[in-house]
UniProtKB/Swiss-Prot annotation:
UniProt keyword list: Cytoplasm, Ribosome biogenesis
UniProt subcellular location: Cytoplasm
Keyword Cytoplasm tagged: yes
BP-aspect Gene Ontology terms: ribosomal small subunit assembly; translation
Organism: Chlorobaculum tepidum (strain ATCC 49652 / DSM 12025 / NBRC 103806 / TLS) (Chlorobium tepidum)
Protein name: Ribosome maturation factor RimP
UniProt similarity note: Belongs to the RimP family.
Function: Required for maturation of 30S ribosomal subunits.
Protein's UniProt keywords contain Cytoplasm: yes
Pfam families per the UniProt record, alphabetical: DUF150_C, RimP_N
Domain of life: Bacteria
Any single Gene Ontology cellular-component annotation: cytosol
Length: 173
């Protein structure tokens, strides 16, 4: 029961804040542990989410949960709530995140046509994701490793998202 109330409060609050800000906030990862006493939420937007947005969302979710009369633990505020953005070096978990990282350096572990593990590091050129994409995929231009990242001179590689094992945006210094 508590988990359902928490999920409902999160969904309603995100919907309201998205409507007022004009920027759609979406959940990357959510975890409700210890019977609802520990709530961890990772959110993002297509432009990236700021610390201020996380704080505002956290305050709004907390207020909604504390106003919940159906659960005494929630209404008394006896829970920990953590709202954050995806960290640097964290794997991509939601297809929509690829759109935000177009043009950036990404390392992808995937399975090729023979189901053999492969890895490519390169510039994310294209992301065909969402309901309009018949075959969700990403296109990457490989780069050579070294101090100066430059293209490897190979044609871009298109990888079906169903074949992606792990994808992590790389920091470029």
């Amino acid at each position: 029961m508590t988990d359902d109330l928490i999920k409902k409060a999160i969904g309603e609050t995100i919907g309201e804040l998205s409507a007022t800000s004009g920027e759609e906030i979406y959940v990357v990862e959510a975890a409700i542990r210890a019977g609802g006493r520990k709530i961890e939420l990772t959110v993002d937007t297509d432009k990236g989410v700021s610390i201020d947005q996380c704080a505002k969302l956290s305050r709004a979710i907390r207020a909604r949960l504390e106003a919940c009369e159906e659960d005494s633990m929630l209404s008394s505020g006896e829970f920990d709530l953590m709202v954050s953005s995806p960290g640097i070096g964290e794997p991509i978990q939601v297809q929509r995140q690829y759109l935000r990282h177009l043009g950036r350096l990404i390392r992808v572990n995937y399975l090729d046509e023979e189901e053999q593990p492969k890895e490519i590091t390169g510039k994310l050129l294209e992301a065909a994701v969402g309901p309009e994409a018949e075959q969700p995929s990403i296109t990457i231009e490989a780069v050579k490793e070294g101090r100066k990242k430059r293209t490897a001179g190979e044609p871009p590689v298109t990888i079906r998202l169903a074949d992606v094992v792990r994808a992590v945006v790389q920091t470029e210094l």
